[in-house]
Amino acid sequence: IKFQANVFCGLANIYAPVYRQIHIHGYKDNNNGLKAFDVAYKDIENAFKYYLNHFNNGNRIVIAAHSQGTNHAEKLFTDFLLENDSILQKVELAYLIGMPVHSLIKDYPACDDPLDRHCFLSWRTFSHGFYPSYKYSDKIAVTNPVNWRRNGAASLYNSHEGILFRNFKIKHPKSLSAVVHQGLLWVTFESFPMQKIFERNDYHIADYNLFWLNIRQNFYERMKVKVEDEKTN
């Protein structure tokens, strides 16, 4: 919540579900792990339905998730949202971050353009040149959260707005470049003070933090276009 959901503070109302999260080792247990995942997901689905009935009040919806939450959010699409078109039409954006999500979610595609809506955004961040031992392929959807494109050249360092630190300060703008490669987001850092604390291969815990202000500003721009479209119509 502190470093991820708060990217939307002041731009949207934020509702976070309380759920019985599966332990990380449950992902390796094909029996009890799957049962625990189903329990966790059902908590998410019930919380979302409660939100719809008590808090939504006809407003548009943005779904934002990370890691295990992304697995549950993807299942929420396939098991609930895609079966309820009137609710699906309210979902302006989905941030499905930190887990592999394939490009083909029926009737809800990956975003291609910095101002697209009614689509999902996804990325998993690694150091440039690193391949994880688990899934990577061109069939996995990835959006570059600096230039908001799904492919093409690496983003410019000048386009990076900074990194959100644990003290809630944004530091080191223009310090990284990102490029999409085989279902991964590869990042390269420019030299800056304390850079060594960022020297790792897997940036899973910082999937939001590394691009926090880029995410916030882009979200504002997408919603600004929505409001302008509504005024025009």
List the model feature ranges, each with a label:
Residues 1-25:
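Active-site machinery of serine-nucleophile hydrolases
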Residues 28-59:
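Helix-loop module immediately N-terminal to the HCX5R catalytic loop
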Residues 45-57, 79-225, 229-233:
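Surface cap/lid and interfacial helix-loop subdomains adjacent to catalytic sites
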Residues 65-73:
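Gly/Ala-rich beta-loop-alpha elbow adjacent to hydrolase catalytic centers
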